[in-house]
């Protein structure tokens, strides 16, 4: 199984894909935590929950690491931004995001002893078969694509009829996980 993570200091999305099929997705809202340390503690708790769901034997026996019938074998994380994007990101924002990306990457490695792989958002969308037409917002295109093609993917709307913010992060995590699955398939074919 593949765990895909779309890391952000506001809302982080998670998705698990098995054999190319979405089996789990969720997010954690970190906006209520005011510093990177509190955000890290919340992330660790969320990753532990996922670890317990997919790495442990949940039949009540006190089995150890990796005893799940279908454990997570690979972790894919969206690569953090490395450049300014036309007034969208300040140096401070990029620095904080990169730092948090590194912390969460380490937490994932520490908890499940799997070295995360990093994939850029554009590359992930390409691997997942999503094309973003020029001039359109990638997050909106991804959301619409998944709503059309992924029966397990459901979103909630605000009272104004807009997708709730976590919908976009969950969708991005699904794309990262599906891209990770496709990349692993490509690696197996080459071997």
Locations of regions flagged by a protein language model:
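Phosphate- and other anionic-substrate recognition elements at nucleic-acid/protein interfaces
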Residues: 1-191
